Amino acid sequence: MAELHIIGQIVGASGFPQNSLFCKWGIHTGGAWRLLSGLKEGQTQVDLPQTGYMAYWSHPIDLHYTTKGLQGHHHVRCVTWRPLGSWQEQIAQTFVGGGPQLRSSNIIYSGADRYRLHTVAMGTVELELGIIMRHFDRY
């Protein structure tokens, strides 16, 4: 079987209206991929930068997959969004903070329900990933 190692980090994020940021992340693959080691989802710590507009996390990513077929790709810069609540929730968010949250993150990955989400664009998250492939020449 072909093997894929992903070693890197979630560097940080910029372009968000607030400075106190964390990142909840996940790697989702097709049925041909199997995770051998590492965590396929997680959450960074919160960073509140004292200077500048970049929140730094340096959150490590270390994954080892095996696959029977080739599919998928990776991104280095990820644009982000957040749920957009009702106008009452938006006003409350302005004065109190917080904001609407998804009841279940599974709605993001199913195309049938995703079209009902109302979202607003936010900043970008930067990743540095090193990819090591083994036995891909056999497939």
Where in this protein do the model-derived segments appear?
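Eukaryotic Ser/Thr- and acidic-rich low-complexity regulatory segments
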Residues: 1-139
